[in-house]
Amino acid sequence: HDALPIWDERYNYASLPLSAGPENGTGLSCYFAMPFEKGARIEIENQSDRNIDAFYFYVDYLEMAKLPKDMGRFHAWYNHNLTEALPEGETEWGVTGAQKPNTTGERNYVFMETQGKGHFVGINYYVHCPTPMWYGEGDDMWFIDGEKVPSLIGTGTEDFFNTAWCPKEAFSHPYFGYPRVNNDIGWLGRTHVYRFFIEDPIFFEKSLKGTIEHGSNNNLTLDLST
């Protein structure tokens, strides 16, 4: 949960389940429960071109005679895409013409896709915006248990992350935050936001596909990672 390697930067942030602490975001902590029944293996991979002189770790675990039958397992899903704007070009807030609605979720950025039973507990969303244009009008859309039409549709990216009015202020809350905001003109540059569904998980019985538009009706080119 450090800044993505493609950014090659570190910074502090604090949330209830995850944190990156001093110094300069190098103290990484995770408080998600990760049940296992037969065994568990934790690996650390150096994906940089630099040697690691020292690595400190600490793991807490609890031994039980038997896990409850309904105990789930913890899963994380990574995705990274350079999205494509509409053929007619980029626009936002209808500046260069009327914007059509997106009713199917086609061409949305996918941040979660899985089969089986479970509940969604959170997302780290990294956006590298190549222009000063506001990146956050894309709606989140959730396809639960094989839905063709999403039953949950949001009202904008910043709304999905519990904020409003195009924020550019660093902020951390136990369940949502903007630990890294762009420092260039408009919204040009890198922004990291998160939201954790601890009190309001999204449940599914058969499958879940979580998506979000990149701009209204997917009209922006954005470098997105989750």
Regions flagged by a language model, labelled:
Residues 1-226:
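Beta-strand-centric surfaces of beta-sandwich/beta-rich domains
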